[in-house]
């Protein structure tokens, strides 16, 4: 069982979740919403980072698939993936939104061998675009991604459908519905 009540309190205390129904926030997607989520603020205290990673670990224990590698989405998913990878003693990779235009031109940084089972960590899922992009990038390099975990999700029906279409489940520690 995930302790969403405690996580809700930590998110509100840290300012990671803010409400303003009178003056909605404008998201990058253009949506106007009465809530704003910035999970990077959960990074400010080691006990918050560890708590989030322990919740991810509990979610992972319920899966039937062994995980070889932990992946974080750039940039906000990386620190949470790092904390989880450290706890689990697993290799870590991270996935950029797009390949670099210089150097090796990598979209994925870190060791990934074809056939490895990868757990993707994202801080926030709204429309799912960045996480799905990361799943596709990992699969293109031969990684197997069947699961994506996030700290917070808005629980949009369309987002669940998009993840179903690519045969990847996503699970959130905290959802908009839980907060209400």
Regions found by a protein language model. Name each.
Residues 1-63:
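Active-site-facing substrate-recognition patch
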Residues 2-13, 136-180:
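PRPP-dependent phosphoribosyltransferase catalytic core
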Residues 30, 70, 92:
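Conserved hydrophobic/aromatic pocket- or pore-lining residues that grip, position, or stack substrates
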Residues 56-68, 135-141:
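Phosphate/pyrophosphate-binding loops at sites that engage ATP/ADP/AMP, CoA/4′-phosphopantetheine
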Residues 65-74, 149-150:
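Short glycine-rich phosphate-binding loop at a beta-alpha junction
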Residues 68, 116, 146:
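Conserved acidic residues
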Residues 81-119, 127-133:
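Short, glycine/charge-rich flexible loops or terminal/linker lids adjacent to PRPP-binding catalytic cores
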